């Protein structure tokens, strides 16, 4: 590629503002342009980089048995209605009707469609296991696009899906994907942490995220440096203290005027927060199959010294989205904001943390202005509809595995894998005949990587004050050839010859043949960030050597013209070998072995 004819120009400064310096560099390097909120166009350099990333994905997925397919972005809504996600997913799922009035969706993920295909293509256990994958543009109407490619509305996604006869087969596939993901990210040059995560709207029994640690990330992780435990905050468990076990005492009402917070309550009564119960009032909107929207009121209770985890609450009540109840809604169930508890309320789903359920004689709201109750006990004073872990893990909490302190870190999720089990196959009737002739639901897994988000994280990781420093495996070109004279000169003739010989040797070259000052060309080479730069000018002709510069290290060397091609081929091979050396098997966490 010659820069004199390249579509798209480098920029001295990035248009607009972004909290991601990597995103600013992608714009300055003529990789992409923003065309709308959360919507981007890739220019030739950026799209070539995306294709390099996709090549890594294809190679590793095919290595573990994946077969590439292409599924439609437009899905019949009926498939999504059969699984229920049409009704539980909010406005981020784009819904529309065709001219015949049929409901359709723009699929932001393809569990329904691939299950439909599995139902039609897999008949017997002899056809299992199978795995398919695709690389496709998707749309999710995200309400808060941010940080360039990190949070967008339209995006390129690699999604893969596996079919197995049973949970043991799925566990084997899950382990293979876990290892393949680590290989993919290392081959691309991105350090990631694999952490337990919430299954979210995907459903299933187990999920892991692959997270790039960065201060600009939206995800909060809980990490134990002692034993290696790591989880997204939405799914993180921790070692909870032992509950109080004193015998039930008599329920007693006590005046607490103005004590509408746990802090005020503990100060007024002189009790520790650990002996109080905190009420959280939430609401979930549920759309029925007739598209009637009903609102479910939820009252969650955690210990006063802890915080509620809305994701865990939503999982227990099977609600995709929760919102705070209004004061009017709180009154409707017989509660009082600031003095609320499940005691005496009606028309509400009560969700209680396991530690509260096991504790005795807590202080809780009396559902009367200025009043609380002493000695509240679950089972006697109110009944829980759901009991489980609904508290949020925090820095300093005890690791559930080893008891050491947890710490927090921020990061960006670049990939996620799920054990779906039979959720979708059961809903859509995707079955196979086993060896005994019995019909059984297919056991499924799904595995996704955000390709654009991966590029964004690579730009964040591989940069300096001058520009990008892209790994050789994903850089749009391997060599930046810079001519510091006009094309008709002796230096120009040498540069053209080197350009042709490099391409003939299989080296991908971006040739800066523009009529520009040397400073402009060097600045552009730095911001684009190809692994190696070759400079040829009048001094090169006089010395009989070209300057070769490593972008990552900044080290330069004079290489005779008759050795330039061989030297660059050698250096590219060495850069690839350095990356390959990072691809080593790792010990997998115990949870991925469980069927």
Curated annotation (Swiss-Prot):
MF-aspect GO terms: aminoacyl-tRNA deacylase activity; ATP binding; proline-tRNA ligase activity
EC number: 6.1.1.15
Cellular compartments annotated: Cytoplasm
GO biological process, one term: prolyl-tRNA aminoacylation
Enzyme class name: ligase
The keyword Cytoplasm is assigned to this record: yes
Entry-linked CDD domains: ProRS-INS, ProRS_anticodon_short
Top-level taxon of origin: Bacteria
Protein name (database record): Proline--tRNA ligase
Source organism of the structure: Salinispora tropica (strain ATCC BAA-916 / DSM 44818 / JCM 13857 / NBRC 105044 / CNB-440)
Gene name per UniProt: proS
